[in-house]
Amino acid sequence: LYIIYFITAQGWTMREITLLAPAKVNFSIDVTGRLENGFHTVEMILQSIDLCDIVTAEKTQKGVSVSCAQHYVPNDQRNIAWKAADAFFKACPEQGGAHITIKKNIPVSSGLAGGSTDAAGVLKALNRLYGEHLSREKLLGLARGLGSDVAFCLEGGTQLARGTGDELTALPDLPGVNLVLVKPDY
């Protein structure tokens, strides 16, 4: 967690924050049913891992912008990180705006929740940057509105996920588990 403060006439003010957004793995998944909307209900054991994207949020006067060096990651409202920032500012309309920078380390389309963890990172960063206006419950509500994995990525750790994957129960940390990830180039 990196925080940059600036001195203003009113004292120190936070201008920018950088944090790690960890990937997740599914240790188990059981499909328990199907909803009318076509989604399946599940029970899963999920785990945050040390592979992380880096998310930086910088205060701006208004609006949302996103930048990511990888050409295949959209830098507009198609990006879930942009959607997360937009949701935050709709929930806190009295706040300003933000420029979000994402450094991708999590492979895209790998099932490791790279986009979801970036969205969760944006919610955490903006809430911290703008003075913790939203409670944990409110942040989880925003996360659930963005996608099932976003709620898990906001909480992290080891979790039992039920429903569509966004009903979470914390589990004890898994002791001494070593994990090797392999991502083929195809």
Where is each model-derived feature located?
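ATP-dependent small-molecule kinase catalytic core of the GHMP/sugar-kinase superfamily
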Residues: R15-L20, N26-M44, E132-Y186
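Short, Lys/Arg-enriched N-terminal segments with co-localized hydrophobic residues
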Residues: L1-T13
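N-terminal beta-alpha supersecondary unit
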Residues: R15-G96, S109
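Membrane-embedded alpha-helical segments that form the functional core of polytopic membrane enzymes
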Residues: I100-V108
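DPxDG-like acidic metal-binding loop motif
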Residues: A81, S110-R136, F152-G156
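Phosphate-handling active-site elements
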Residues: F89-T101, A125-G145
